[in-house]
Amino acid sequence: MVKVRKSMIKDIKSVLKDLNQHKYIYVLRISILQFLMTTIGAYLLALLLKVVLINSNIPGMTTDNLLSFLTNPLTLGLLFVYLLLLAFLIYLEFSLLVEIIECKEAKLGVGLFYFKERSRHFFKSISGWHFLAFLFYLILTIPFIEFLVSSALLENLYIPNFISGELLKSTNGKIIYFGLYAIFAYFNLRFIYALPLAVTKKDNRFAVALKESWWLTRGTKIFRVLGFASVILIIVAIISLLSATGIGLAALVDGSEKTFWVETLFLSFVWGVLFAGRLVFKLAFLSYLLKGFDPKTPQKLPIRENKKQHRMLALTGLLLLIGGINFTYNTFKASSDPSKNLAVIGHRGMLSQGVENSLESLEASAKAGASYSELDIILSKDGHFIVSHDDNLKRLTGKNITISQSQAKDILGLKIKQNGYESHLVSFEDYVAKAKQLGIKLLVELKPTGNEPDNYEQLFVDKMKELHVDSSYLVMSADLKTIEKVKRLDSAIQSGHTISSQLGDFTSQKVNFYAIEDFSYNELLARKAHQNGKKIYVWTINSRDDIERYLETSTDSIITDYPTSVREIEKELAADDSYLDYFLRLTNLSWIEKL
């Protein structure tokens, strides 16, 4: 252990010294690499994805059409090519990062021969089943991308909130979630050297790199990786100091009111600081990992001073280009207006004040000032709509009862429990009656189970008319065929498609709105929806940082478990909008103010 600690301290000092000595050339070169990966690399991937979607005859891939997509041999082949290109770009990016570290001030040898050799080594590394090992490694790193050395192409990838959110709603789910997180964390630590090994030891197959990384982190050696935390603290301290300087200058120049150009410059400054910080972190961590297995690559000779000056001028020009693009983007962002009259929809009522989809939860949602309250309904065996998210009632009742296989009289009134609250299962009619009494409208989500009769959609339309809410309530479903048929049967119903994950464009223009999960939302999709006369809702937005972020987008509605929080944060943002608050929102650090 003592030997590991001494080696760790020695390597940390060496990394910091190297970073300080070559900081300008490092930041400039990696900035260009990051820029090329997120423009040309991302464009190639987007273009190939478009080819995949065109050949599958669908505008976008969702959970509705996933099966037909995967059973098409042509799209499967193109999808394999897409994954292969993604793997190659990641491999190439890390190869170039290693080259930058090794060259330092020397000329980068990245000509045609370099790319030819890298391509040959890549295909050798992932040939056969080793490609599956590489994909397994990438999937394994997803929960920890923001904490590890990750590709620029994967930095915005994370586990969708609807997956983790559902697991965290029950005790067993929490055990599973945190248990899996701990297991994934352990495997990430054990495989931390895999990618650096794969790009430096050119004859290695990827599975061999995984095995070697496992060996390098055995026993007390795993603590060497954790020792990098001290370097992270230093980088965070520098970023904090620069950020504080920017906040102070912006507040001094602009006073209490934000003007357009100062806001634009401030956004650009924040982006630049965070961008540089990420690059330095990536470079420092990779450099530290390389020292862990000592590839013994000789340092290349430095270039002559006059050539160094020419190269620095060229690199500075390219960096100014990147900064100009960033400034243009932030000019657009500063001039864009956030969504006005944002609708707040209580997700299954208000979970913090009652059992989901219960009358008490509905009442709490109404008192919180929600515009709508969302609920889920499932058809019983005898044709009655029951308010429930799950077909199987075990999660809330403890009883292994399936709604779609049961008579309504046998399940209505069953006691349901969640988070210390108790209630009972109710019918759609009783829920609507309570909503009318409270003066709140509903967003009804249809949950077909596959056991419904052929006239399922007609039964629902008739029920909406019977309750006189067919034109005032919103209706949505994750089953696109179901919601499109409902719209066809009654055009007065405001219909929407529930989208849990999506690649590409929207798959239907027959609905009135799209309810899209946070993971798949982006401003480009929102603009397309609005151009086509559709509204876009985003779910399920619960954290303060996410709420603040979406309050400044063009989304039409936020679906949340905490409607009270959304209304409170709306008021706070309107009352307190200093540059410090602005910075904390941009960096997802608003929670600091609540400490």
Predicted region positions:
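Hydrophobic alpha-helical membrane segments
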Residues: M1-V344
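A cross-domain feature marking catalytic cores of carbohydrate-active enzymes
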Residues: R348, L375-I377, L446, S477, ...
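Structural preference for beta-strand elements that scaffold enzyme active sites
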Residues: N341-I345, Y372, G439-L443, S472-L474, ...
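C-terminal active-site rim and adjoining tail of enzyme catalytic domains
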Residues: L226, H497-I499, G504-L595
